[in-house]
C-alpha cells in the first residue's frame, strides 16, 4: 500500500497490483492481486485462540478451512452471515459449545466438518447440516441428533431406512394374514352349504351319474 499527501494536507491511498513473493527459495512477482477473497485455507498451522466474530464480515467467502489447528472457544454466531459459503472445515481443534443454529440457513453449504472437537448439544436439523455423513460430527462426546445415532433424549436413534423396511415387512405380514382369513371364511361357508344341499337333495344330473340307490336282494 502506498499513501501520498497532497498540498491540502489530505492523504490518499493507492494499492499496487503486484507483490513480491519468496516461495520454496524462489523469488517471484505475483501480479493482479485479488481484492476479494473467496477461499481461505489456514489448515495445519497450529493457530491458537478463538475464531473472531469478524469472520462473518467475509460475506463473499465460498470455502473456509481452519482444520488441524488449536482454536478454542465457541463457533462464532456470525458465521451464519457467510451466505455464499459452500465448504466449512473446522475439524480437529478444541472448539466447544454448540453448533450455531444459523448455519442451517446457509443455502449453498454442501460440506461441513466439525469432527474431533469438544462440541455439545443437538446438531441443528437442516438439510445443509444433516446431509453430510456422521463422520463429519464424530469425536464430539457431547453432540447428539442426526446424522449421529445418539439421540438427545438418551436413546439411540434407529437407522431410518432399516426402520421403514421393518415397518413395511410387518404391514405385508398383516395384509397376508388378512387375505388368508378373508378367503378362508367364505370358502368354508360355501363348502358346508354345498354339502348340505347334496345331502338333502339329489338333483337329476347327480342321480344319472351315481345311479339310484338300489337295495340288494338277499
Swiss-Prot record:
LRR repeats lie at residues 34-58, 59-82, 83-106, 108-131. The keyword Transmembrane applies. Residues 1-178 are extracellular. It is a single-pass type I membrane protein. GO terms for cellular component: plasma membrane. It comes from the Eukaryota. Coiled coil: none annotated. Glycans are attached at residues 65, 113. It is found in: Cell membrane. InterPro entries: Leu-rich_rpt, LRR_dom_sf. The chain crosses the membrane at residues 179-199. Its main location: membrane. It holds the Pfam family LRR_1. Keywords: Cell membrane, Glycoprotein, Leucine-rich repeat, Membrane, Receptor, Repeat, Transmembrane, Transmembrane helix. Residues 200-218 are cytoplasmic. Gene3D superfamilies: Ribonuclease Inhibitor. Belongs to the RLP family. This is Putative receptor like protein 25. It comes from Arabidopsis thaliana (Mouse-ear cress).
